[in-house]
């Protein structure tokens, strides 16, 4: 619910007169594009051909947004962008926490005429605020040219702070993260605030978002009053023999001689059946994201043998089902799916 929460915050900010909203949406393009899409769908209402979201039609919608970035173009990709000229509409920017787009936004703000700039009321939302924004190089370093110690900051931290400085005093900065530990340890007092802008330490508040009624998280999976995992409806203990076989499967030399464990096969069938149930519920459910994670080792390279083994299994099942179970292993596969179906 993190994105939904700050989408609502953007809407409330616009209602209260904030006219420039900047979302710092992580370090990579895929997250930025995903966030841009969500905000166009759920905030601006410009994605009209969707099954979900809000849909704004007609001229009577008085708070129409001025969308600066697009799904395809981050801020630094935009050509011939004029300085801010009209603040009657709330402006929306979704950008990566990279040096180039942050520099371009500061240049764009600095190029705005002073009589308009003084009326900017900006909300900066830092998504994944513990990733990229933290000053990981904070401290003094020796400068051999000047023969003295100088403070230095990591590049993204510097650019985020310069962005806040360019908008000062008319801005609010709100960070969102599931893991705020690093943010708590940010130095609240910096010596270079005048030149680089304020510290990103959460001076004013740190709050936990309220869980929705249908939320399933750590408190539901591992409740405090639960004596063991055996009491949980969400956890199935992997048999020790299966766990040993999974560990063997990451070894290329032993892969061909190691079958996929029964518990993993059952989990894959359960996943396929659950997906079939969702698809049968209609297009709206079938189009939703649906994934399964198989996690044996922490590195991608060591997981590749298991990926190949699982893909071979799925390809074999697909051919068997396409032949309407007429292949030699057809009756056995059908019986296995039926067994899992009746179990779950």
Which residue ranges define each predicted feature?
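Motif I (Walker A/P-loop) of helicase-class P-loop NTPases
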Residues: 3-11
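Conserved Walker A/P-loop ATP-binding site and its immediately adjacent core
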Residues: 17-60, 178, 298-301
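Conserved nucleotide-binding/hydrolysis micro-motifs of P-loop NTPases
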Residues: 28-31, 98-101, 130-131, 179-183, ...
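Conserved strand-helix element at the start of the C-terminal RecA-like helicase core
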Residues: 287-306
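Conserved helicase motor "Helicase C" RecA-like lobe of SF1/SF2 P-loop NTPases
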Residues: 302-318
């Amino acid at each position: 619910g993190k994105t939904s929460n700050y989408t609502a915050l953007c809407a409330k900010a616009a209602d209260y007169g904030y006219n420039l909203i900047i979302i710092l949406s992580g370090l990579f393009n895929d997250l930025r594009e995903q966030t841009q899409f969500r905000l166009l769908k759920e905030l601006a209402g410009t994605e009209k051909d969707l099954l979900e979201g809000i849909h704004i039609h007609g001229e009577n919608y008085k708070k129409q947004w001025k969308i600066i970035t697009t799904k395809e173009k981050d801020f630094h990709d935009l050509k011939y962008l004029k300085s801010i000229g009209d603040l009657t509409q709330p402006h929306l920017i979704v950008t990566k926490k990279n040096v180039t787009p942050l520099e371009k936004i500061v240049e764009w703000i600095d190029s705005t005429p002073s009589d308009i700039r003084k009326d900017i009321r900006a909300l900066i939302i830092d998504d994944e605020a513990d990733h990229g924004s933290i000053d990981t190089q904070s401290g003094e370093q020796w400068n051999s040219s000047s023969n003295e110690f100088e403070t230095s900051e990591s590049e993204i931290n510097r650019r985020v702070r310069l962005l806040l400085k360019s908008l000062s005093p008319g801005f609010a900065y709100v960070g969102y993260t599931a893991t705020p530990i690093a943010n708590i340890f940010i130095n609240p007092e910096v010596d270079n605030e005048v030149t680089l802008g304020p510290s990103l330490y959460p001076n004013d508040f740190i709050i936990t978002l309220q869980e929705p009624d249908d939320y399933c998280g750590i408190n539901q999976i591992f409740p405090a009053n639960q004596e063991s995992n055996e009491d949980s409806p969400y956890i199935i203990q992997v048999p020790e023999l299966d766990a040993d076989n999974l560990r063997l499967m990451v070894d290329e030399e032993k892969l061909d001689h190691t079958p996929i464990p029964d518990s993993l096969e059952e989990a894959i069938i359960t996943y396929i059946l659950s997906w079939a149930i969702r698809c049968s519920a209609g297009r709206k459910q079938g189009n939703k994201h649906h994934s399964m994670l198989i996690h044996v080792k922490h590195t991608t390279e060591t997981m590749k043998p298991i990926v190949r083994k699982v893909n071979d299994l799925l390809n074999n099942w697909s051919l068997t089902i396409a032949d309407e179970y007429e292949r030699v292993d057809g009756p056995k596969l059908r019986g296995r799916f039926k067994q899992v179906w009746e179990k779950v």
